[in-house]
Amino acid sequence: MDKIWHMGPRGDYTRKKRAGERLNLTPKPDLALPGRTEALPGLKGKGKEQGLRKITEKKELSRLTGSSSQRPSLLSVTGGEHLQENSPGQETPEEKTPPCETVTDTFEMDSLLSSTELVSGPAEQDDFSSCLPSCSNAELHTESTDERGSSFPSPELFRGSDCLDWEHPKLEDYMFYKNSTLLDTSKAVVIEKAPQFANLSAVLSSSSKNYEKRHRKIGMTLAAQHLSPEPKYASNLASVVDNAASEVVFAEKTGPPTTEKTQKKPENESEDSGPLVQTKLSSGHPDNKALCSPLSSALESTAVRYTLLPQPLEPVLKKGCILPDKQSKALLTSTPSSDIAEFVIDLSPVQNVSFEELFPNVSNYVNSSEVVPVSSLQESSSNEFSPNTSEICCIIRSSPGTRQMRRKDPAVKNRCSPPKDVPLDIIMKTNGRT
């Protein structure tokens, strides 16, 4: 028999060749060869040991991947090689075997191989089935690692070793205590356990009351300024009065006691004359001479100066409060009627004010007794001084809103006119050439 057919464990037929024929088939990888190597110890001779060694070598080379349907062919290949090694043409010096023994040995080996395939078939299936869950577990492990790498809160964790805590060197612990903004939430405190702040209601109420008082004072000062506008030289007078007040306070401390006696008398007199001045202001029709004449105001200011102030303050008040007759007339005649009220100074209400209120440290507030209605001042000024209406018209005309219109020069048009001697046709031709 040249060819032997034998049936595998799954019903597929494999073809085996006799001794002396070489096979050029390369063994394909297989996963479960340990059963095959365990079933071959029944063979005898050194040639069989050489076959066992080659089977183990092929087992080491064929551990990657393979199909179970090609395993009987691999077994047949190993058997053929074994037969080829024990062929009658090849004789070892130690032992010579006749050809009849080799034929019987091949039959025995085929039977043994078939039995080993029957035994090792279920084991190989079990190995293959056990390999599948291991591969699936490996895939799941790789997927979980990829998901873990992609589920990091932010790339800020991988900036360097400074970001990681030495107390928690593991990344999982670090992620447990850190969020995406790298805030340490482990040391956070609940709001209920936080220390209570002090009661700020008293502070807020006091600040609101102070704000209301200040707002009222500002409103009163604005209303007083709206009723009686401040004079243009009010800042100069305020500075002079402040300096005078400081000098008066210094003179009280160092001055002789005779000044105190002289101060008490005019205060009593001022208290007596105070109601008369208040009745005049409340009536709304005061005398024109008492309000507007600079001579009466000068006399009153000199009386207050001699009674209340020491000697060194006389030149200061002469420069600041008393206006000469010529300068006052020039100012009043050169200004319109609306500006006349600013230059009138009435010092009559000063008499009913105490010495401390006469020279206050702060000159931003206006006393209500000093407020004079503007209508009465305008009536008195219209009776005493005649305003110059032409100057008012000049001021209106010199406003920046009105501008003179520019006139076009008729001579400019004559420059472009053609000459009288040359006709129009010739001019058109010359223009076309140029």
From Swiss-Prot:
Interacts with CENPC. Interacts with PLK1; required for recruitment of PLK1 at kinetochores. Keywords: Centromere, Chromosome, Chromosome partition, Kinetochore, Meiosis. The lineage of its organism: Eukaryota, Metazoa, Chordata, Craniata, Vertebrata. Key regulator of kinetochore function during meiosis I: required both for mono-orientation of kinetochores on sister chromosomes and protection of centromeric cohesin from separase-mediated cleavage. Acts by facilitating kinetochore mono-orientation during meiosis I, when kinetochores on sister chromosomes face the same direction and are thus captured and pulled by spindle fibers from the same pole. Also required to prevent cleavage of cohesin at centromeres during meiosis I, possibly by acting as a regulator of the shugoshin-dependent protection pathway. Residues 64-76 have a biased composition (Polar residues). Its main location: nucleus. This is Meiosis-specific kinetochore protein. A motif (POLO box domain (PBD)-binding) lies at residues 334-336. Germ cell-specific. Expressed in both testis and ovary. Not expressed in other tissues. Disruption phenotype: Infertility due to defects in meiosis. Mice develop normally and show no visible phenotype but are completely infertile (both males and females) due to defects in meiotic chromosome segregation during meiosis I. Monooriented kinetochores split prematurely and sister chromosomes separate entirely before anaphase of meiosis II. Residues 46-62 have a biased composition (Basic and acidic residues). GO terms for biological process: female meiosis chromosome segregation; homologous chromosome segregation; male meiosis chromosome segregation; meiotic sister chromatid cohesion involved in meiosis I; meiotic sister chromatid cohesion, centromeric. Residues 391-394 are annotated as: Required for localization to kinetochores. It comes from the Eukaryota. GO terms for cellular component: condensed chromosome, centromeric region; kinetochore. Residues 1-102, 249-289, 404-424 are annotated as: Disordered. It is found in: Chromosome, Centromere; Chromosome, Centromere, Kinetochore. The gene is Meikin. It comes from Mus musculus.
